[in-house]
Amino acid sequence: MDSIKKNTINRINGLPINHNNLSKTSIISMDDDYNSNSSFYSTNNSILNSVTKNSNYLNNNNNNNNNNNNNNNISISNCNNNNTNNKINEQLKTFNNIFEEKGEFLKEEIDNKFNDIISLMNQSKNQLFLSLNDIDSLYDLSPLSTTSTITLENNNNNNNNLIKFKLFNNDSIKKYILPVSSKTIKFKQRQILIEQQEFNEKHNQQKHLLELQRQQVLSDQQNQFQEQHKQQLSLKQQELEAIQQDTNKVKQQLIETHDKLLIEKEKQFKQDLNSLELNLQNKFTNEYQSKEQEFNKKLEQQQQQLEKQFQQTKELLIVQETLTLKSKLTTEFQEQLKTHQDQINKQELLLKQQEYQLFLKQQEISSIQKQHQDDLSSLKSKLSSDQDQIKKQLLQQESDLLKKQQELLLKQQELDIQSKQLKEEQEKQQQQQEKQQEKQQQQQPVVVPVKPTTSTVVSATTATLIKAPIVSTTTVSTATVSKLVTNGIAKPTPLTTMKQTVTAVPTLMDNKTRLKKLVPTATTTTTKEENNKEYDKMMQELDTQPNNSNLKNLNEKKLETLKQQLTFDDSVSFSNGNDESSINLSKYLEETNKSVENTFDIMSNTLKRKNEPIQQPSSSSSQLSSSQQPSSSSSSSSSSIGLKKRLSDDKTTIVTSKPTNKVQPQSLNSNINNNVVPPSPVAAIANKLKKQQELEKLKLEEEERLRKKQEEQLAKREVEKEQERLEKKKKNDEKRKKVEENQQQRILEEEKKKKEAEDRELARKHKEDSDKKKREEEEDAKKRIQERFRETQEQERKREEFKKQQQEQELARIKKEKLQQEKLQQEKEKQEKQKQQQQQQEEEQQKKKTVQTILPTPQTPSRSANNNYDDAANTASATKAKYALSSILSMVFGATKSPHFKPSTSQDDQDDDDCEDYDGTDENSENEAKGEYQDDSDQEIEEQFENDSDESMASTESNGDIYFNKNKNSNNSNNNNDVNQSRKDKSIVFDSDSLNRNHNDSNNSSEEEEPERDPVFLTPLPKILSNMKNNNNNNTYSNSPVIKGLSPPSSVSDYSPSSESNDCFSPLTPTNNNKINNNKINNNNSNNNSFNNSNSYRGLSPAQIIESHTPKCINRSGESKTSPFLTIRNTPSPLKNSPIKFNMSSASSLSSFDSDNDSDYNDNDIDDGEILGNPNENFTTPLKNQENNNNNNSNNSNTQYPIITSPPSNEDGDENYYFEEEEIDYEYDKRVPDWAKNHNLDNSLKQQRFYDPDRIFSMIGPVYLYEIFPKQDLGGKIKDFSKVKRNLSSDWSRDCNTEKEDISYKKNMGFTNPIIVNKK
């Protein structure tokens, strides 16, 4: 805070501000010393403004005098300026001392009062914090004596409003962050952007041209000041006396105002304290009442809570009584439980005993099972060994079978022919069988038909061996045949494709004993891969075979023949009474039954269980399990019955092989008793049938038991499912209830949240309103601070400019003195050189005379007769002879043809003054002489140009103009004349080679050093080179040489404030054709004019612009008759035909124009033969030019536009439109809107430039053209623009801006936080 206070005091006193003490963002309260010092701002500003006006007026006069006076008047003006400046500085120091003393006095008083009030507030806060616990202690608080508001008057002439600031209330204290360091930068950036936009617009052309006119006015004023200088000096003294009187009056007024302010502040301070006391009393009373109400509410709440607690105690007593009853019942129930538990314990002991007994039994059973498992494992090992042997045999058999399959495939086509033959063969077989039966009855041997299979197990009788044809048949299951029939394929399949089991070979014991054991050989198993291969082969064969409808009939007939054979065999065995025949028949039946069963199992497993290994039960395993079964006769009978049933079920048979007559006999054991007679086969068959029926009954009973168990299990499962379903229902109901409760709770919570949100929104709206008010007040305060800060900056800037001007004047004076001294020294050196040259000439003349005396005549020899001369005499004569020879040769052959380069002696004395000696031996001496000459000439030119450059720099910094002044041009012309005269005096004989070298070097250096354009090196070219270039090149700019330090002419439209700081200047020199009536410029020679012709700008010189008076304002674009080089603007002016009505009285324009006065000026006012120097001439100036390009066809450099100057404007501001028609009445014209008919529009627009647009946009909505012009006639049709949307019509009057465009426009204008109002 102290740093801010210091800065405010420094602002009052005009001292610089210490920004180092401030941070980037400093919190400033509106209750600080700003209020106390606000009144001093206005008074101080008014005084300082009056002083600065006077000082500026004097400074302008002094500057004008300094620029216009010649070297003789410089010293006088400097003395006067120094005296006036010293007086003004003394006055300012006195003012600053007075303000410092009184400001510190007020500051101390305000600080003391402020500290007292803060101490009182702290005491009251401490008392409040202590009294919050005890409500009764609030009565003891005493009110505080503090002030609430302080009113201060602004002494500004424009606004006499009262500024009120609320103090010492937390709600009213308004603090905001003021970026001290960045605000000024943003403000400057904003100004730069606005200036750039203004210069980019069309009417900036007029602004720049008007600035040139302003310079012309200044030049006229300078001429007037030169004439009236003596009168002004007398007036200045009178004005100084008046200023002193004014300052004395101001001092008295300040003292009086200071006393009044002190009295008023004391009164206001007392009033504020009283108002604060009243406010505090009101607050305390309100707070006490609010707390009493809260206390009463709390008491009521406590009473309600006590009533609730009383009811809860009653409920607790009732609960206790119920608990006592429950405790009694629980004791009784526990006693019953104890008795019941005793019983349960006894039962558990019994159960444990039973379990122990069962455990013993289980151990016995497990031991028996282990024994059985050991036996089984031994049997399995034996079987595995047998299986390995059988597998080997089967592999060999399979190879044979594959060969047979190929043969069968070839014979399938002959099946139709063989079917007929088979019928005949069957009849023959029947006849043969009948014959054989007759023979058997006679001879009593029995013929046993043997089944020839791949695993041919053959049995033979003991008595005889009979060769008979045996047909081997196989039966296929109905499932497989049905599949084949559905596909239309009922084909014979070879039986060799199926895996067959090796039948067990029975061993016959003694005749008295029965068949006891049947030793099993092995069972075969096949892998999945083999089954898959076999199955695929079978199906392929079936697919390849043709469909024959006769196969079915053939297979049916074969089945019938098999049945007949079986029945015939059974009848034969019953009729025969011999033991051997019955035994053989039983064996045959067993073998056939086993073979058929094996075939059925193999077919079913191969076709149905294709992916599983086949495990076929053998007759041996069945016989081991049933070791105590009846005899073989009974088994044979039962097997024959089973075979008949299967044959009756399966109606399809397939012939697998041809009948074979080969039989392998086997010899039976010879130890068979012929006396043993087996039982009859009928009894065995009957027993078998009984056993089968019993087995079927047992099976049915077991199936019923299983079915009952399944039904019971199903019933249990259904019951369990119903229970589960009921439980699920209960759970679902509970979940639904919970969900409903949660939903209700959520609804309540949402309602609460909505209410809270509404409350928050209301609070937020209140806060926003309060924040807006605070922001507006803060913005007002910021603007006021910024305005005052700007004023202080302007004052500081003016002071700095004034100091700079003084320093520049002193520097210019010092430089001029130095230049005078240097010139004097140069003149002395020249005189010395001339003296030396004269001495050298005299010596040369003496040498010539001595040569004539030394040279011998043709009659006398050149030598003397005496040979005894001294050495000194010989050397002297030798040197004299050399000089004599060189002079004679130069005289005879000429200077250019002589072997030694030497200046000519035939010139006059004026030419000999500038010549220099050259030695004849070294070529370096020639170069050194040339270099010395060039250095001397260049030094003279640079010294003269430095004088001009210093003056030009001073003029540009003071006035901010790009062009050269009139005095500078006159000085340049005079200096150039002096240089040219000095150059004419000098004449030296140069060699042709050296001239060419110098010419080329100058051209190269000028082209290479083109981009260097510092003002220090703005030296004109030597006169010799400029003449040579002008002779070789044309006068156009494209063919002109590029001169070091001279930039091409810059266009007017490219002018900007930043161009003042540029180092390059555009040379605007006059041409030969433009005749100027100026005595100072007429002194230029023809050589100077040839140099000026190289300028291709073809425009006007600064001298022409300065000397021309303000012409009449004529809006026309005709041909310029003043000079032939000025071109005509072919296109009409864009401002004349533009639809925009320029308001020239706005902030961007310079002055207002009268459209009526323009019509008064006629074209006949100006004669064709007038010159630009005349005051009433409408001269033209260049508007635009291209860059430094060498294009000869550039036309833009030749386009020029007339200057439109403003006539004397009316101060009323009634007619502000310059490009309007003459006969329009603005008050009655329907096309002019109402807001444009106001007479005070000019003043309002001028005041509008000081307003911040952000504030205006936030308060007022945007205005669109359809609101101003809602309807318009378009070809007889009225169009309503209020309904028109944005179109790409390229007509700005029909399009409406979007939000993005508004934001981008405001950002480009420099406002960082644009506010966009809703267009609705």
From Swiss-Prot:
Bias-annotated ranges (Acidic residues): 908-926, 934-951, 1155-1170
Q: Where is the composition biased (Polar residues)?
A: 653-668, 851-863, 1062-1071, 1120-1136, 1175-1187, 1199-1209
Q: State the compartments where it is located.
A: Chromosome, Centromere; Cytoplasm, Cytoskeleton, Spindle; Nucleus; Cleavage furrow
Keyword tags: Centromere, Chromosome, Coiled coil, Cytoplasm, Cytoskeleton, Nucleus
Residue span of region Disordered: 53-75, 426-447, 611-679, 701-877, 896-1215
Q: Biased composition, Basic and acidic residues: where in the chain?
A: 701-835, 981-1000
Could you tell me where the Low complexity compositional bias lies?
54-75, 429-447, 615-640, 669-679, 864-877, 965-977, 1026-1040, 1047-1061, 1072-1096, 1143-1154, 1188-1198
Coiled-coil regions in this chain?
221-444, 683-855
What does the record say about the knockout?
Null cells divide much more slowly than wild type, have a high percentage of mutant cells, become multinucleate and have very enlarged nuclei.
Can you state the subunit structure given in the record?
Interacts with aurK.
Question: What exactly does this protein do?
Answer: Chromosomal passenger protein that seems to be required for chromosome segregation and the onset of cytokinesis during mitosis. Plays a key role in the abscission of daughter cells at the end of cytokinesis and in the establishment or maintenance of a bipolar spindle.
Q: Which family does it belong to?
A: Belongs to the INCENP family.
Name of the protein in its database record = Inner centromere protein A
> Source species, please?
Dictyostelium discoideum (Social amoeba)
